Amino acid sequence: MNVSFSIAPYFFKERRAKLNSFRKRKVEIVAEIDSLLKNSSSLAIVEYRGLTVNKLEQLRKEFKSAGVLSKVYKNRLFKIAAENNGYLDLQTDLVGPNLFAFGTTDAIAPAKIIAKNAKEQPLLILKGGIYDNQVVSAAENALISALPSYTEALTMLASGLQSPLKQLAFGLKLLIDEQKITA
């Protein structure tokens, strides 16, 4: 008895359609990463191996409140997008479970938040990233995290300019109080 199965062509056709949809999704993800790399002011890569889900969610909430977009992508897809944008030196940092933090409003915020949390959570490892359209190493990223943010720098400048004026006003007030000069 000769029995033929006509299910094989249907199965392969459905499987091929599924693979095409996976491939389309990967192309969309690479395009998304490409867009983020072009539109972000900075990128910090952090390895989160061994971190609990609660700690990771807490880190993501802190990123979100600072205006930092954090995403987990497959390293292979990120490598493709990095190559498309000319960031070939990033490939050495794309090993292991990585979280990508894109600085959209404040360029220093991703590295600063990661460095602060890495002190409390030694499992967080600040890797390289992108700052000012240049690939930076982990050591350079650590230096960037020590820089003041834009608002902190403005506050420091304002207090630096205000301090001599306060001292002059205080000195003049003392002279007036001692009646060495008249107002």
UniProtKB/Swiss-Prot annotation:
Transmembrane stretches, start-end: none
GO biological-process terms attached to the record: translation
CDD domains named in the record: Ribosomal_L10
Keyword tRNA processing attached: no
GO molecular function: large ribosomal subunit rRNA binding
Entry annotated with the keyword Ribonucleoprotein: yes
Any one GO cellular component localisation term in the record: ribosome
InterPro entries: Ribosomal_uL10 (IPR001790), Ribosomal_uL10-like_sf (IPR043141), Ribosomal_uL10_bac (IPR022973), Ribosomal_uL10_bac_type (IPR047865)
Keyword terms, alphabetized: Ribonucleoprotein, Ribosomal protein, RNA-binding, rRNA-binding
Cross-referenced HAMAP family: Ribosomal_uL10
Quaternary structure annotation from Swiss-Prot or TrEMBL: Part of the ribosomal stalk of the 50S ribosomal subunit. The N-terminus interacts with L11 and the large rRNA to form the base of the stalk. The C-terminus forms an elongated spine to which L12 dimers bind in a sequential fashion forming a multimeric L10(L12)X complex.
Function as written in the Swiss-Prot or TrEMBL entry: Forms part of the ribosomal stalk, playing a central role in the interaction of the ribosome with GTP-bound translation factors.
Family: Belongs to the universal ribosomal protein uL10 family.
The protein's name in its UniProt record: Large ribosomal subunit protein uL10
Organism: Mesomycoplasma hyopneumoniae (strain 7448) (Mycoplasma hyopneumoniae)
